[in-house]
């Protein structure tokens, strides 16, 4: 029998074992589509970003006008910019749903896969932040000023750290230049981390909606899930192009269409929608260092999730009390996102403080207690 090149070629056999002959649980639902959708998001962002970078000038006097020039004079430059800006939103929608799926079905018990995923989230957040500064509009400039200033809360070395990040005594040309360099570099770092993430995932195989061992019922990835993924790509790309063509500025801040002016502070500085939950937690503590620690904890808490798992069952599929808590947490995150977009005044301050407290309480206290209670209920 002739050797099968797909299974014997050094490169093709890696692709084969990851995308073609990969044994996959037969019952995984559409919630398992978001991993591949994130891959498509990354690819789209790198392609549109590369083409935008060809027309961008990383200089404070030219950055804003170079973006305007791209939109007005470059063939389909407006489309590239709209796809890239809204592609970032879709990236975050997909990653939040992907994390939510992992949380709901207990996928975090694949600890290496989960931890590399959290590192990927942090890298994505850093990439989005430095990218938002590049158009050099009002919100770009003041967002960069406010967020980089948070490093000054670090005891003893804080101020030095901020000036080192800025490359001077304020956000200026050196800051923009280095942010552009970082924004170009980080997506490739994300691509590398994704390969590590997949390597760890394929060591254990995918989890499934029942949260039980599925070795006795696996099917090949291709054609079953490759087709399912392609359907996902089509739906997501349709939604992305619809947003980019019909409502390109729906999710962006109008203040960013004004060139950066260090002498005029916007009345209400806020980041893009995907950072608002963390921004609300940061603002809910009336102390700089405390706020920064809470901000860091709001994302880094994900590293603790595997250690807080006390249930005898893996997924939440058959755990109604924990399901209730999960949806409370989701609702709470929506409230935090809304609060982050509001000015710092009554009643938003107290709502933000309550929602921030609830966020940490649900994850650190209520989930483990409820799991223990459900374990007890299994005995009756």
UniProtKB/Swiss-Prot annotation:
Ribonucleoprotein listed as a keyword: no
Single GO BP term: mitochondrial electron transport, ubiquinol to cytochrome c
Major site of localization recorded for this protein: mitochondrion
Residue positions binding heme b b566: 98, 197
Cystine pairings recorded for this chain: none
Residues engaged in binding a ubiquinone: 202
Transmembrane segments: 34-54, 78-99, 114-134, 179-199, 227-247, 289-309, 321-341, 348-368
UniProt entry keywords in alphabetical sequence: Electron transport, Heme, Iron, Membrane, Metal-binding, Mitochondrion, Mitochondrion inner membrane, Respiratory chain, Transmembrane, Transmembrane helix, Transport, Ubiquinone
Subcellular location as annotated: Mitochondrion inner membrane
Cofactor note: Binds 2 heme b groups non-covalently.
Family: Belongs to the cytochrome b family.
Other facts: Heme 1 (or BL or b562) is low-potential and absorbs at about 562 nm, and heme 2 (or BH or b566) is high-potential and absorbs at about 566 nm.
Entries under PANTHER family matching the protein: CYTOCHROME B
UniProt name for this protein: Cytochrome b
Gene name of the record: MT-CYB
């Amino acid at each position: 029998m002739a050797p099968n090149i797909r299974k014997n070629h050094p490169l093709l056999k890696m692709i084969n074992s990851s995308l073609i002959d990969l044994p996959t649980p037969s019952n995984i639902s559409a919630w398992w589509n978001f991993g591949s959708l994130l891959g498509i998001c990354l690819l789209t962002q790198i392609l549109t970003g590369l083409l935008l970078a060809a027309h961008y000038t990383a200089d404070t006097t030219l950055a804003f006008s170079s973006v305007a020039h791209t939109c007005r004079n470059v063939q389909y430059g407006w489309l590239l910019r709209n796809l890239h800006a809204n592609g970032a939103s879709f990236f975050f929608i997909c990653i939040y749903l992907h994390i939510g799926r992992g949380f709901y079905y207990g996928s975090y018990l694949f600890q290496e896969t989960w931890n590399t995923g959290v590192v990927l989230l942090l890298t994505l957040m850093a990439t989005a932040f430095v990218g938002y500064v590049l158009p050099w509009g009002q919100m770009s400039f003041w967002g960069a000023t406010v967020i980089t200033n948070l490093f000054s809360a670090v005891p003893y070395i804080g101020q030095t750290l901020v000036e080192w990040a800025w490359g001077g005594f304020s956000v200026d040309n050196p800051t923009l230049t280095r942010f552009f360099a970082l924004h170009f570099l980080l997506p490739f770092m994300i691509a590398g981390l994704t390969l590590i993430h997949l390597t760890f995932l394929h060591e254990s195989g995918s989890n499934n909606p029942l949260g039980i061992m599925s070795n006795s019922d696996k099917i090949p990835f291709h054609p079953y899930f490759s087709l399912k993924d392609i359907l996902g790509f089509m739906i997501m790309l349709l939604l992305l192009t619809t947003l980019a063509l019909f409502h390109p500025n729906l999710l962006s801040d109008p203040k960013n269409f004004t060139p950066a002016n260090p002498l005029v502070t916007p009345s209400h500085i806020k980041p893009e929608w995907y950072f608002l939950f963390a921004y609300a937690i940061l603002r809910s503590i009336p102390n700089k260092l405390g706020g920064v620690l809470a901000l860091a904890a709001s994302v880094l808490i994900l590293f603790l999730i595997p250690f807080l798992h006390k249930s005898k069952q893996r997924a939440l599929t058959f755990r109604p009390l924990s399901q209730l808590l999960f949806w409370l947490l989701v609702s709470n995150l929506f409230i935090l996102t809304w609060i982050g977009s509001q000015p710092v005044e009554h009643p938003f301050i107290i709502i933000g403080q309550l929602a921030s407290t609830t966020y940490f309480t649900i994850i650190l206290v209520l989930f483990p207690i409820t799991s223990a209670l459900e374990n007890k209920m299994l005995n009756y």
